[in-house]
Amino acid sequence: MIANSSTDVSVADQKFLNVAKSNQIDPDAVPISRLDSEGHSIFAEWRPKRPFLRREDGIFLVLRADHIFLLGTDPRTRQIETELMLNRGVKAGAVFDFIDHSMLFSNGETHGKRRSGLSKAFSFRMVEALRPEIAKITECLWDDLQKVDDFNFTEMYASQLPALTIASVLGLPSEDTPFFTRLVYKVSRCLSPSWRDEEFEEIEASAIELQDYVRSVIADSGRRMRDDFLSRYLKAVREAGTLSPIEEIMQLMLIILAGSDTTRTAMVMVTALALQNPALWSSLRGNQSYVAAAVEEGLRFEPPVGSFPRLALKDIDLDGYVLPKGSLLALSVMSGLRDEKHYEHPQLFDVGRQQMRWHLGFGAGVHRCLGETLARIELQEGLRTLLRRAPNLAVVGDWPRMMGHGGIRRATDMMVKLSFDL
């Protein structure tokens, strides 16, 4: 048994999660700002009442887990392509090219050819073989961190672990990680509905810079032709003749982006949630066989991805409510992972709970996350090393808060020190 494995975060979340305010909203015109700051409480109120809400920008937020699973693979829907960008008035440029040419925002044969070259490299067997290398990365990070007292956990551990891992997988120079992570965290804002028009110039500039970096990496790999993932991938897709040069760039750009940003956020929140309950933290220190369960529950409780987009190809009836043909949908993972039908007392962070067989946070069907296994291993090994090397870790100042409700979410920084003596 895990001692005191559950925490009533519906009360305790005042430390570091979004505190509920009044939910007096129009369910057919919900402000994005309210969803970003009060998402959990809004979803908890409306999920029993109706299967979806409509956001102020016209996008429908699907709230219930069963409907999210259904619509993730339902032939009456498809993955969005450039619709969200066009909806925001973006019709060209580096960000538009990223959306237009990446496997994430494609369907059918186009999606298949863009994904196929990466699928083998991210198979469970291939990725599981990386576990020792990932564990080594965590140890090296703590060799340096144990020399300091107070430090920014988000920047110095949670960010570094996935960046160094993806650099290792792709054969990128480790010294490049500060450069590309800086760009990744700016570009990834385009995968959230919360970016403001005045922010787009910076997002676009960062996308241009990241695209140029990936292009140079591909050129360097072509000159050296080493026996690494990147060289093998480029050789395979070029022999198959399935991808254009811009598609090569965008698939690798997506891997760098997806492999860095979401794991960073998850590492911060899993650690914070475990630290919030000293008895749970002590149990994890004493029996690390519970680490995987803590990671799964952390990904449920505060998923780093708030929703997945789809497009309705026909009118779709959900429990008497109709999603109109042509509607842009956001399948709210954030809501579905707290659906009372599937989770008893979903507002509790409970490491001992039974999870659904397929974790909703990684998507569904042919678009299910390629990096699912890699993310889990990074989080598990990151937490294991943390428990062993920093057993007296303590948060200094404010606990981190999760921000956002759709696409990629963000966690505020977490400052820590290696002692409970504050």
UniProtKB/Swiss-Prot annotation:
Sorted alphabetically, the keyword list is:
Heme, Iron, Metal-binding, Monooxygenase, Oxidoreductase, Plasmid
**What is its induction behaviour?**
Transcriptionally activated in the presence of wounded plant tissue and by plant phenolic compounds, such as acetosyringone.
- InterPro entries given in the database record: Cyt_P450, Cyt_P450_B, Cyt_P450_CS, Cyt_P450_sf
The protein's Enzyme Commission number: 1.14.-.-
Q: Which cofactor does it need?
A: heme
Where heme binds, per the record, is at 369
Q: Which GO terms describe its molecular function?
A: heme binding; iron ion binding; monooxygenase activity; oxidoreductase activity, acting on paired donors, with incorporation or reduction of molecular oxygen
Superkingdom, taxonomy of origin:
Bacteria
Per its UniProt record, what Pfam families does this chain match? Answer: p450
Record family assignment: Belongs to the cytochrome P450 family.
Any idea what job this protein has? Not essential for virulence, but may be involved in the detoxification of plant protective agents at the site of wounding.
What is this protein identified as? Cytochrome P450-pinF1, plant-inducible
Record organism: Rhizobium radiobacter
